[in-house]
Every structure is written in C-alpha cells, then in structure tokens.
A protein has these predicted regions:
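Conserved N-terminal Rossmann-fold NAD(P) cofactor-binding segment
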Residues: 3-41, 56, 274-279
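Short, well-ordered amphipathic alpha-helical segments that serve as non-catalytic structural scaffolds
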Residues: 13, 44, 69-72
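Redox-cofactor binding/interface segments in oxidoreductases and associated redox assembly factors
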Residues: 44-46, 87
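Conserved NAD(P)H cofactor-binding loop of Rossmann-fold oxidoreductase domains
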Residues: 48-50
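Short acidic, glycine/proline-rich loop/turn micro-motifs
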Residues: 55-59, 255-256
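Rossmann-like NAD(P)(H) cofactor-binding subdomain of soluble oxidoreductases
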Residues: 58-123
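C-terminal substrate-binding/catalytic lobe of Rossmann-fold NAD(P)-dependent dehydrogenases
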Residues: 103-109, 118-280
Length: 280
C-alpha cells in the first residue's frame, strides 16, 4: 500500500508497479491507500520529506521534515497501527528518534536505515580495491548517517583476515588509502545529488534489505539506526550501529570492541546528534 499527500501520484505509482507484478515471481496487490488502512500493517516505511538540495547537510532538513512527520504520525497512530516503523527520511537518526518519541513505541520497533547504505558503499569500494566480492568484506560505517560517520577500521575484515593484514599484503596499499575510501563514502550522497538531484536506488535497496530481514526473521546483522540504552556508554539517542534484525525489529545491538579513537568518534557523533536534537 502506498500513501502520499498527492493521492493521484500514489495511484500512478501503484499502477506502474502492478504492471510489473508478472515479472516478480510472486503474487501481490499494490494500491494507493489511506492512513486508516495502516491499522493491520506489519511494517510502515516512512520516506516522506523535502528533498536534500545540493551541498545541503542532512541536518539542515530537520525542522522542515519534523513538521511533515508530526502530521503523518498523528494519522497513522489514529488508525491503531502497532507494527514496526522503518524510517528513511533524512536526517534519519534524528527523524527516527522523533518517530520513537511521538509514537511511544518500544525502541526495537522503531528503526532507521542508519548507515546501512554507507556500509554497502564502503564494502563496494573495498571489494573494488582488493578485487573481492563485496559480500565478503566485513566492514561497517557507524555513527550519524552524515558528516560525522566513521569506519572502525580495527573491526574491518575480509572473511576472517583483518583489513590491516590484507592491506599489508597488497602492493601499494597504505592506511591513508583506506582513509580516502572512508571519505569517498562520506561524500557519496553529495556527489550523487550534485549529478542527478537525489539518491534513489541505493537507499531503496537498503530499505528492501532491512524489510527482508524483518519479514524473513533473519537475525541478520545490519547497521541500522537504533536507540542506545547504555551500549557504547551512550544513552537516549538513535544512531547507526550494527544490530541483529529479525521479525521483532531490532533483536539486539552488537557492541564491537572499538579502539580508543573509534570510541571517541562515536561519542562525538552522538554528541553532535544530541546537540542538534536539542535545537528543535
């Protein structure tokens, strides 16, 4: 079911998607609905919001997108919805926290896409560099989905080989190159927006992956935006960290043994998000 403030657009999108059902390998009904139809939904994916402009920080979108969410959530909650929220609207960590606080839902049922896409971008770039299938590059992007995100390189591996060992065995590979990859990940969205005005496919695939983990009860480890309650020494904030995702939403948070500098970078990212939230 699709809901949009522009009902005609939602109807057109539903029609377009329905025309491809024959190629999907399954049966489904796609239609434009109303907020009252949310009552029996298992999952609501929130993507509404103003588009990010060229060189605009995700955090600059906050006040405008909060107003949009307040209106949407009022209607959704009136329907009696009691499933899982998946938030993709930027700035996603703060928007997810807004959904959590307005809805009153338990934190495991309110999830943000977090740094799932950033992690996929990182693994793609590492796969290219080392000529390895990205699915075998086990590295994460943590923190805010934005400028303060970081890679805990001490935890990065190819299969079970630490990335530092792999880099040492690769001619011409230096830690500085890894830092350049990290910066490339951080700037990726800005470059895409500059080229084509918005990001569509990567985040769409990230949302599909998280949804699959939920409906398939997969217990998959994904870097989603989750509510910290003492993990990593932080509390009361949503931020992108590795989590086990299953049918209940976030089954648990995975605490990685971060190094001293990595802990500080996570703390700084949390502090930045908290300060921004308090400015609302």
């Amino acid at each position: 079911m699709l809901i949009d403030i522009n009902k005609k657009k939602a109807e057109g999108e539903a029609m377009d998607l329905n025309h491809g059902v024959a190629f999907s390998g399954g049966n489904m009904e796609i239609y434009a609905g109303e907020y009252s139809d949310c009552r029996d939904a298992d999952l609501i994916v929130l993507t509404a919001g103003l588009p990010q402009k060229e060189r605009q920080s995700r955090l600059d979108l906050l006040k405008e997108n909060r107003k949009i969410f307040e209106s949407i959530l009022h209607s959704v909650l009136q329907s009696g919805f009691c499933g899982i929220f998946l938030v993709a609207t930027n700035p996603v960590d703060i928007m997810t926290r807004i959904v959590y606080e307005i809805s009153g839902f338990s934190p495991e049922k309110v999830i943000g896409t977090g740094t799932a896409l950033d992690t996929a971008r990182l693994r793609y770039l590492l796969g290219e560099k080392f000529m390895i299938d990205p699915r075998n590059m086990h590295a994460y992007v943590m923190g805010e989905h934005g400028d303060s995100e970081f890679v805990p390189w001490s935890q990065a591996m190819m299969a079970t080989k630490p990335i530092f060992d792999l880099c040492g065995e690769t001619k011409g590979c230096h830690f500085q190159e890894l830092l350049e990859l990290e910066e490339e990940v951080r700037m990726a969205a800005y470059k895409i927006i500059e080229a084509k005005k918005a990001t569509y496919y990567g985040i769409g695939m990230a949302m599909a992956r998280i949804t699959k983990a939920i409906f398939g009860n997969e217990y998959s480890v994904l870097t989603v935006s989750a509510y910290l309650q003492g993990e990593y020494g932080e509390s009361g904030i949503y931020i992108g960290i590795p989590c086990v995702v299953n049918r209940m939403g976030i089954q648990r948070i995975v605490e990685l043994p971060l190094g001293g500098e990595e802990k500080q970078r996570l703390h700084s990212s949390c502090e930045m998000l908290e300060n921004t939230y308090q400015e609302i």
